[in-house]
Amino acid sequence: YQTFTLNDGDKLDIISTNRSVYGYFSIKNGFTGEYIWESCSVNTKAKIGSNNGEKYQSNQKIFINKNESLSEYKKINHLNSKIEYIRVLKGTNFSFFSEKAKKIFFSNEFIVSKLTDRMGMRLEGPKIENLVETNIRSEGLIKGVIQVTADGNPIIMLSDHGTIGGYPKIAVVISSDYDRLTQLTPGSKIKFKSVELDEAENLYKLYEIETKNILNQIR
């Protein structure tokens, strides 16, 4: 990330990148307008958010709150790894999978599919078979849960996932790795690493500290 101070008439061009999925643009003291759930973003499918839930149009003015100058700061952190290691906890249905299936899940690379969207990240790789019927009793889902579908491919639940699901859940991505996961583009390679709950909790505490430090530098 990098900070900029803009004066009247200045223009800032924001270019796209093929190294990550999302980019973030932050204004000191934030935007004016309606905030829903502490956000002024727009969800056009649900028709909620600022701008009456409608998509912002080209050349439409967006107003910001009065702010002061910001100290210049720059930090570059690229995703250059050929394989992204994502840490997970064992899922609620972990026992539904054979030892062979578990070994396949943790020993092999998976590729992010082009079919990935905000509901789920679909992965392609060696098939994972379970010991029960593919469709089990539906259970509640949370962000980061990894289900194994009927074709044996894992799918990771993302921000717009459904509330319940009936596929076996082999694992769940730990909270401190979730943001990094969602920046992976189609074609990226993933390997999963199992961690215990206490380690995941400690990693999340470190993640919170790092995130707060970043926010304090750009506010």
For every predicted segment, state its role:
Residues 1-219:
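Conserved "landmark" site that anchors the functional core of diverse proteins
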